[in-house]
Regions:
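Functionally important transmembrane alpha-helices
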Residues: 81-151
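Residue-level signature of the transmembrane alpha-helical core
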Residues: 27-32, 36, 61-68, 83, ...
Length: 188
């Protein structure tokens, strides 16, 4: 992912006392690179191609699973539970972004949301727990997690792969799905 591409610049700029440089660096290297590139590839290219060739359901499911597995590279070590949580979380987040692209008829709103997510969470501004996106959490604002349960902490990927996050992705996806259905009912 774009995270590996940007690891060196971020490790240089994300130092205590250099908040604004860190924020700007995170925005450009992590946010834009990963957010826009992942949305372009997964929602803009793979999803659209599969939607035309395989139908809507497979076009949602297959890229979502690919998106999840791509993020395995972010984890230094993992066991079966870490992997299961990451695949569930990554797939759920990918489906959420896909529904957002379908609802808006564009990848740009999803790319903006993905960019902000990456900038704030992965870019070192805000983090929950000891691990963020498979890396040690060195964020400026850290909310500690007192639990050692991987179901809550997301294991070796971080809180983004925990059950609360997965429930959140699914809830947002269902909400977007309701809006899509309402629009279809108005048109149909």
């Amino acid at each position: 992912t774009g995270v590996q591409t940007c690891a060196l610049p971020i490790s240089y700029i994300a130092r205590p006392g250099r908040f604004w440089i860190s924020l700007i660096g995170a925005f450009f290297s992590l946010g834009i690179t990963a957010g826009i590139c992942e949305e372009l590839v997964f929602r803009g290219m793979i999803f659209r191609y599969m939607e035309k060739t395989l139908g809507l359901k497979l076009a949602v499911i297959i890229p979502a699973i690919l998106f999840a597995f791509l993020h395995i590279m972010n984890m230094q070590t993992f066991d079966l539970l870490d992997l299961v949580l990451l695949v569930l979380a990554g797939s759920s987040a990918a489906v959420m972004f896909t529904f957002y692209a379908v609802k808006s008829a564009s990848i740009y709103p999803g790319a903006l949301a993905h960019t902000l997510w990456n900038t704030l969470i992965i870019g070192g501004v805000f983090g929950v727990g000891d691990i963020v996106n498979g890396m040690r959490n060195e964020s400026y604002i850290i909310i500690p997690i007192k639990s050692t349960s991987k179901l809550l902490t997301g294991g070796n990927f971080g809180v983004e792969a925990g059950l609360p996050a997965i429930v959140g992705y699914i809830a947002v996806t269902l909400l977007i799905g309701i809006f899509i259905k309402k629009e279809q009912m108005k048109l149909g």
